[in-house]
Amino acid sequence: MTQYVIIGDGISGSSAAETLREEDPESEITVITDEGEPLYNRILIKEHAKGKLPEAPISIHDEEWYDERDIDLSLNTFVTSVDTDAKVVNTHEGEEIPYDKLLVATGGTPTQLPVDNSDADGIHHFWTFQDARAIREHAEQANKGVIVGAGLLGIDFAAVCGAQGIEADYLMRGDRWWRYALSGKGAEIMHEGMREVGVEPV
C-alpha cells in the first residue's frame, strides 16, 4: 500500500489528493495544512473582507469531503522538517508522518513587512481566510488605514478600504502602482480609481 503525503491544501494539493484517490483506491493519503479550514476560494476572500460575502460561498470543501474519500486531513499543522532519507515528515507537535511519495504544494506567500512590530495588533498580511476575517473585523471599526506594497495584494487591500469607507494612504516604493507591468498612463488610471474610493497613492 502506497503512502502519499501532500503538504498544502490549496487547489493543487486538494486536486492531487482527489486524483490519487481515484487512481489508487487502496492507498493512504494524508493532506497537511497549517490553515484552520479545508480548501476555500482564495480569490473570494477579499469580498469577505469587504463585507460583501458571508463565509459559506467561499468554502469549496468541508471536512466531510475528505472523510468521504478516506483522505486524512491535518488542519493547523506546521511541517518543521522533512527527512528525505527516512521518508518522514515532522510536524510542530512532534508527529512523524511516513510517506512513500511526497508532494509539496504550499504555493506562495506574501512578503512580510521587514520592520519591528510588523505582527502587532491591527497590522495585517492578506493571504488566508483567517487574514480576511481579521481584516474585516478591524475594518468595520477603523477610520484610517495605511497600505504597504504596490502589487496585486495591495490593490486588494485598497479595495477593502474603499468598500469599508476607510480613508487610506497607499505607500509605494516606486513612482506608481505595479510599475513593473503598467505604463505611467495606465498606473494613473488606477491611481484615480483609488482616489475615488478614498485611497491616496503616496
Show the residue positions of the predicted features.
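Glycine-rich Rossmann-fold phosphate-binding loop(s) that bind the pyrophosphate
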Residues: 8-11, 127, 148-153
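Beta1-alpha1 glycine-rich phosphate/pyrophosphate-binding loop at the start
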Residues: 2-72, 160-185
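Rossmann-like dinucleotide/phosphate-binding beta-alpha-beta segment
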Residues: 147-171, 195-198, 202
